[in-house]
């Protein structure tokens, strides 16, 4: 019985870390940046769908519904939509696809439905798709949600994070953003969203798959860093935070701008 309990705890821990990209603060940052760049028309339509609540309010909804009535009534099928795995030497196209879907197929399906079949969707479906798009565009930019299949998106790569054992996946899900700055999500937004129009335009161009492959490239740098230490369980602390804070900031900012672009396109 004791052995079963230990195994169950391990499995639950894996499920938890594999879904919570950026943590709630990171998702709030992405949604808040996007909200600042919505067109007036998109704002009105979103405000109506969400009954006056903001997309920030629902940015982590897709994580929070696990083990809820929503989850038991079919949304457990979206469990694999939070990520896609790409092994070293592969691209998204050359990897065997998850039969349950992934972050790209989920986003593509919902965006197409919201753009081309909007009038035929029920209000409840529109609302749920909106909440999930807000969340998954954030996950699309979280490096370990584009990690290798061989180590389950960084879950199998153990590291010491300020002398505490964890996984590379967990570092990027929430620990990195909490260690980089002691800011609230609104302070993150105020300090990140200061770029020029040209940068925004360039970042907003592209497809979900192209954006995802950019995240894969960034994930590769993290794997290279960890492997270069030569340690069985690499020790990561202040130097790692210093070296990769710019990547953290860039991914959050880009996700916010791209989410705004997606929503403005849907609600044009």
What is each PLM-predicted segment?
Residues 2, 14, 138-141, 257:
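Residue-level micro-sites within transmembrane alpha helices that shape
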Residues 20-136, 143, 148-268:
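N-terminal, motif-rich segments that launch catalysis or mediate targeting to/interaction with membranes
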Residues 1-25:
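Bacterial Sec-dependent N-terminal signal peptides
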């Amino acid at each position: 019985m004791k052995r079963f309990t230990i195994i169950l705890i391990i499995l639950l821990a894996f499920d938890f870390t594999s879904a919570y990209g950026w943590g709630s603060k990171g998702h709030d940052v992405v949604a808040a940046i996007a909200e600042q760049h919505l067109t007036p028309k998109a704002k009105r339509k979103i405000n109506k769908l969400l009954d006056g609540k903001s997309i920030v309010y629902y940015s982590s909804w897709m994580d929070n519904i696990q083990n809820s009535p929503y989850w038991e009534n079919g949304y457990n099928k979206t469990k694999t939509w939070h990520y896609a795995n790409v092994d070293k030497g592969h691209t998204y196209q050359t990897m065997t696809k998850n039969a349950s879907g992934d972050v790209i197929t989920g986003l593509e399906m919902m965006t197409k439905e919201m753009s081309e079949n909007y009038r035929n969707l029920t209000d409840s479906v529109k609302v749920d798709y909106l909440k999930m798009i807000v969340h998954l565009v954030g996950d699309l930019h979280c490096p370990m949600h584009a990690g290798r299949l061989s180590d389950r998106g960084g879950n199998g790569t153990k590291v010491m994070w300020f002398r505490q054992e964890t996984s590379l996946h967990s570092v990027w899900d929430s620990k990195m953003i909490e260690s980089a700055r002691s800011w609230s999500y609104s302070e993150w937004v105020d300090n990140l969203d200061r770029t020029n129009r040209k940068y925004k335009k360039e970042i907003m161009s592209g497809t979900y798959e192209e954006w995802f492959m950019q995240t894969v490239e960034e994930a590769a740098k993290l794997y290279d860093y960890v492997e270069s230490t030569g340690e069985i369980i690499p020790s990561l602390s202040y130097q790692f935070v210093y070296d990769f804070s710019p990547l953290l900031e860039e991914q959050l900012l880009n996700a916010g701008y791209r989410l705004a672009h997606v929503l403005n396109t849907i609600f044009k």
